[in-house]
Amino acid sequence: ITREHPFFTIFDHSIHRTGAEYDVLPEDLKEYAAIMGGAGWSNGPEGLLEKNMSFDELGYPWVTHFFSHAEVIDGKYVIVPLPVAEQILASAKNLKAVVGLEIYMGVRAEDDWVNRLYQRVVMLCGKYGIPFLHTDGNRNDIDLAAVIRRPVFTDVLREYSDYVVFSYKQNHANASYSCYGAILGAWMDGIAGNIGIQAENWYWNDAGFCDDIGGYHGYLQGNEQQIPAVFSAQMLLPGLSLGACYYSMEGEGWLIQMRGTDEYEYSPQGIAMLSLLRMMIQHHLIPAKEEVLGQIR
């Protein structure tokens, strides 16, 4: 994952056919992309190795999800045991990265057992040369800013920084500046080798851009699919200005749409996102770290 060869992911946990959002990607963008798969999300806690390896056998470039903010919640969030995680890392042929998604590490107690799990997952990623995408936001906490101030996390992140991408998951409209500052600070301080941005459609709902423009309905309320298509790409632009090399879109349910009965195509939101990514790649728009640091006063 570099500025010359950025990386972007699209989630794969909707009712669409598995891999549909990758199949309809323009050919020139496929080498930069991966889909979210495996068995750390929405698949329940049983047969985690088999589910992950079955997904790998489909042949799609993919990203797996080893843990979240709890061991199991309604079969949706699942923590993958470390021996299983290592077997996946050692055996998978098409795995491109491991993501820690909405893991809320910054607000955990110092002796929380998940802290040790986090450290070991980062170390395993370094052992097998797989990027670790720490992707979080600020769900009622200033989480990213807290992570980069705590040695329980920063010590291992700094040691394995070549494999660490610190990414802001835009799941709230408030506290955005602190999150941008956190990922930039992690990059400047050597805690992360690269940084990223994950656009999330709920952000605009939280900011009041749904149903009736300017009307605030509260978090996770209203119809987020009514946001203008260009907003999807707009959410990624701060990452470009910061030198981010990783970009992610949550919610392929609004990035692709049915065409006829069994085919898919990208929606206006998806087209806006792909157009931006193509421009960034073709015109080498991602600034070098030195350029970004030179703008800081």
Feature roles, as predicted:
Residues I1-R297:
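Glycan-processing catalytic domains of CAZymes
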